[in-house]
A protein has these predicted regions:
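A compositional/biophysical signature of low hydrophobicity enriched in polar/charged and small residues
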Residues: 1-152
Length: 152
């Protein structure tokens, strides 16, 4: 799908505030409400806009620890990849999982209450997976930049 500058302007506004009204978008980009509504519907139907979410303050929800894990599987087979991905998709602590190139296979981002809670997750859920050969855990000391907004 080819996006023009109006589409990109609408997307920038929606990324910064998913609850922004069509009226406010109209005022911001100087376009009437009807074509804005039509463009948003088209962007949704084409899958450019996948869903609308609410970002939560994890610290206020007692999820103060962010951990990045580099996971290496014992064998790089299609079955191992599939089984690992299906299993970790069920763990709510894991908020991001990427299959990567390089010296490990997966890069995970997870949130937990504290180190003790992470240790329990590590020992009881992650390290016991039969296809996992190695896990390197990196504890976030400070988040310098965290955003879901894509550069448009």
């Amino acid at each position: 799908m080819i996006l023009d500058e109006l589409d990109r302007s609408i997307l920038r506004l929606l990324q910064s505030n998913a609850l922004i009204t069509i009226k406010d978008i109209s005022a911001a980009i100087n376009l009437s409400m009807s074509p804005i509504h039509d463009r948003i519907k088209r962007l949704e139907q084409e899958g450019v806009i996948q869903k609308y979410v609410t970002l939560l303050d994890r610290k206020q929800l007692d999820l103060g620890l962010v951990v990045h894990c580099q996971v290496t599987l014992d064998k790089q087979t299609r079955n191992n990849f599939s089984e690992f991905e299906q299993t970790i998709a069920k763990f709510p602590e894991i908020i991001s999982c990427s299959l990567v190139s390089g010296s490990f296979d997966y890069y995970l981002k997870l949130v937990t209450k504290d180190v003790e809670t992470y240790n329990k997750f590590y020992q009881e859920k992650l390290a016991v997976l039969p296809m996992v050969a190695h896990i390197n855990s990196l504890f976030v000391m400070d988040e310098i930049k965290t955003t879901t907004e894509l550069p448009l």
